[in-house]
Amino acid sequence: MDLSQYETKLQKYLSFLTFSWGIIADVDLESEVIRCCGLLRNDIWAVWRIINLRTYRARFSYLSKENEQIVMPHVDNDLTSDWKVIEDDFILFWACQVTHAASNTFNSPKSTLDDGIFRVLVVRASCSRAELVKMFLKIETGGHIEHDACEIYECSAFRLEPLSSGSYNDIDGEAVESGTIQGQVIPRALTMFG
């Protein structure tokens, strides 16, 4: 089973599920105030966040999945020229290593526990609220990945540098230090016996 290691300016984290930023992190973390609603809290807060939609400017840099030997620079250091870079306004950024982030969320249908890659789902700010609703309604079945506004990048490592304020970093459902974060897959880090 693969794990992933994340690094912020102050801390390192291990993970095996997802990293989210943008609307997914906003919904997950801000909906804690209505935890009494159970799983419905995510749906309620997603509607609220779509009505009051936020976009965040960021620089997303990634190494394609073919890069197996990764030497990650410190989060403060420059990246080498083999990293691909996208700078834009985003609604959603979701790096996945598993098919389901929750029982009712088929967020990354093509992920497997040992494929050695992140599947990073990105939605840019050009996506309308109506299109975002259509996409979210298909997350339970995995149909959202067929939507035109849904971009998926397969990579072995990434760095996300928020260029606007107010966003959250969310690893496996928990808030971590905001700001620049980078992650890399640690292939076959755990062996499981059935």
Regions found by a protein language model. Give the residues of each.
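A general structural motif
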Residues: 99-103
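ATP/nucleoside-binding phosphotransfer catalytic cores, i.e., glycine-rich phosphate-binding loops
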Residues: 81, 85-87, 104-194
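Catalytic core of DAGKc-family lipid kinases
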Residues: 1-98
